[in-house]
Amino acid sequence: MTFGKGKKPLLIISGLGDGLATVKGMAQMLALAYRGFTTAYQVYVFSRINELPENYTTRDMATDIAEAMDVLGLKRIAVLGISQGGMLAQWFAADFPERVEKLILTVTTAKLNNLGRERITRWLELSQTGAYKELIFDIVSHSYTAKSFGKFKYLYRIMGIFGRIKDKQRIAIQAISCLRHDSLAVLEKSKCPTLIIRAEEDDVLGVGASLELHHHIKDSQLTILLDCGHALYEQHKDFQKRVLVFLES
């Protein structure tokens, strides 16, 4: 999927939510959500491939991104990876360094800590029992700050009533790939300018994940956005501004 009026390419790699719904048919919504990028950039948003094989890893997913770029004729691109998308972006920058102009790793980790493992395992269990309402409620309750969650919790309860899990295997394979993700040994291979963005109140990955990335990626920049949770890319009004400043620097 692509949108935007600019000439410079920007790739956005989405998170684990791709296991529940791909980006197909969501161009207008995504263009609105990421409107801060659409003037200067031609934005590409990739879902995972349609048929996910067993034992499909975050590294495999990164290789698929390189192949998709070949099809589109994209040689070199700025990459914004969010949550699980950041895991893919780490492998992409390590395995295909010549293709990454700049890298933004947002609310992501090189390896899940105990908190992240607890969250993903819980979501995996709920997804496999078909408990869509409980799954959505649990994701949202841990992704937003208590203040933000309080405003929208009834809306998400209603959404949970009418939604359903379309493909249990798809979400399971992606969740398991998160649980197995470990890129610590290759982070030093990433040579491009890198911005790491952390949420002050991240209740999915905690605060240590971004610090670990910053420690292992040489000359990386670390930005902490205050008063927001894991869903900072939706919550924080300065998120896109910070990314643009980095991209244009």
Locate predicted features.
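Conserved HGGG/HGGXW glycine-rich cap/lid loop of the alpha/beta-hydrolase fold
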Residues: 1-52
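Conserved acidic catalytic loop of the alpha/beta-hydrolase fold
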Residues: 60-77
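Gly/Ala-rich beta-loop-alpha elbow adjacent to hydrolase catalytic centers
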Residues: 81-85, 89
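Flexible "cap/lid" loop of the alpha/beta hydrolase fold
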Residues: 94, 101-130, 170
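Conserved alpha/beta-hydrolase catalytic His-Asp/Glu region
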Residues: 114-117, 134-179, 186
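Short beta-strand/loop motif that positions the catalytic acidic residue
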Residues: 190, 196-198, 202
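Conserved alpha/beta-hydrolase "acid-adjacent" motif
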Residues: 203-209
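Catalytic histidine-centered segment of alpha/beta-hydrolase-like enzymes
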Residues: 228-240
